[in-house]
């Protein structure tokens, strides 16, 4: 189909740099693009935030546009983020080796993770970061490359149950000491619902327009200086230190009103998942008119699948197109009892995590209070 061919033509243009594509919760693959806010342009999906002063620094380009799915996690769950140089995985690689720098992960509690325009602004707290590991002489991005593009963190065990945005941030410093400085931030957000937890309310910062300054030592840092000026001053606030969950009594009324996830769940009847889109079985039919009517409903869904696909790929849409072709073949051959393979789940088995889930050694040195 034309849309499929067009997507393949555009894909090579998105080779540059990196982007977060896939969330794993406790080592379970949620699906490419599922629950992930990302740049929806395949040509620029792996590009850094420009300009640095943009509010896109919160969740990336198109980061104020929510997706329909929210991935469930638990307090203390292991979140693993996969980064790719090619969003659809057409070629291997996570980020160019020259793009050396720190990594950080933030969270923000929101009323509704499926709502637009809730990324930039107050409410963010950092749950993990690491910069330059003097024991291995490697930057976080170098460790990321060594680990096939996988980066893992733990959800704090004591934060409140509810909806959260989880913000990943990679900073490439290869041009940060240029004149003018050109630090490259790669930012995306995942939508999750944290189950369990406690009542902790971490101190937060506002991330948006003007959050980072080119005058910040960690932003304009010279990675080529010998010896390096260490310790490296990681940009942003200090990491929130989880205190664990205290035992506390909960009255029946509180239990009845406790928040439960009711948004962003996988729809019932979904037989094919493509990032945040689902394909649904077409109506039964027993005559020629019904057969072609169901064929049309299948192709209507196919059209939406191709038109709304994230840069992570259209392979699921190709699977759906095969289903529609099968219905057409049945209609043309006079087989008017269907649909064929009714209700068969077509979503491929998700790939296994291909890297270590060990959390990279965190930089725990104390710095002076950070200012942007």
Swiss-Prot record:
InterPro entries: AA9, AA9_LPMO
Transmembrane region(s): none
Chief location: secreted
Cofactors that this protein relies on: Cu(2+)
Any one GO molecular-function label of the UniProt entry: metal ion binding
Top EC class for this record: oxidoreductase
Residues making up the signal peptide according to the UniProt record: 1-16
Family note: Belongs to the polysaccharide monooxygenase AA9 family.
Function summary: Lytic polysaccharide monooxygenase (LPMO) that depolymerizes crystalline and amorphous polysaccharides via the oxidation of scissile alpha- or beta-(1-4)-glycosidic bonds, yielding C1 or C4 oxidation products. Catalysis by LPMOs requires the reduction of the active-site copper from Cu(II) to Cu(I) by a reducing agent and H(2)O(2) or O(2) as a cosubstrate.
Listed name of the protein: AA9 family lytic polysaccharide monooxygenase C
Species of the source: Aspergillus tamarii
């Amino acid at each position: 189909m034309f849309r499929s061919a067009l997507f393949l033509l555009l894909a090579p243009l998105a080779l540059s740099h990196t982007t977060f594509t896939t969330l794993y919760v406790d080592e379970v693959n949620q699906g490419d693009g599922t629950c992930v806010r990302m740049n929806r342009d395949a040509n620029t999906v792996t590009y850094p935030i420009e300009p640095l002063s943009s509010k896109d620094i919160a969740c990336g380009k198109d980061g104020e546009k929510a997706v329909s799915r929210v991935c469930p996690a638990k307090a203390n769950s292991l979140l693993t983020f996969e980064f790719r140089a090619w969003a659809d995985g057409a070629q291997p690689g996570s980020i160019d080796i020259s793009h050396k720098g720190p990594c950080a992960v933030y969270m923000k509690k929101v009323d509704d993770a499926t709502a637009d325009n809730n990324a930039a602004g107050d409410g963010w707290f950092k749950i993990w970061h690491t910069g330059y590991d003097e024991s291995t002489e490697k930057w976080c991005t170098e460790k990321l490359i060594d680990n096939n593009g996988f980066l893992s963190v733990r959800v704090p065990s004591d934060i409140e149950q509810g909806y959260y945005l989880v913000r990943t941030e990679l900073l490439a410093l290869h041009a940060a000491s240029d004149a003018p400085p050109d630090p490259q931030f790669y930012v995306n957000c995942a939508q999750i619902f944290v189950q369990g937890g406690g009542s902790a309310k971490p101190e937060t910062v506002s991330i948006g327009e003007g959050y980072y300054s080119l005058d910040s030592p960690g932003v304009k840092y010279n990675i080529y200086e010998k010896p390096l000026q260490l310790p490296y001053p990681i940009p942003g606030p200090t990491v929130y230190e989880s205190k664990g969950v205290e035992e506390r009594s909960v009255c029946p009324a509180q239990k009845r009103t406790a928040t439960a996830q009711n948004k962003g769940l996988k729809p019932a009847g979904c037989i094919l998942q493509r990032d945040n889109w689902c394909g649904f079985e077409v109506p039964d039919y027993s005559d020629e008119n019904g057969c072609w009517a169901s064929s049309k409903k299948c192709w209507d869904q196919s059209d939406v699948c191709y038109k709304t696909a994230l840069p992570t790929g259209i392979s699921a849409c190709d699977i759906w197109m095969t289903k529609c072709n099968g219905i057409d073949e049945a209609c043309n051959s006079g087989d008017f009892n269907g649909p064929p393979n009714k209700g068969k789940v077509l979503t491929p088995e998700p790939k296994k995590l291909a890297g270590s889930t060990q959390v990279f050694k965190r930089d725990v040195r104390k710095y002076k209070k950070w200012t942007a």
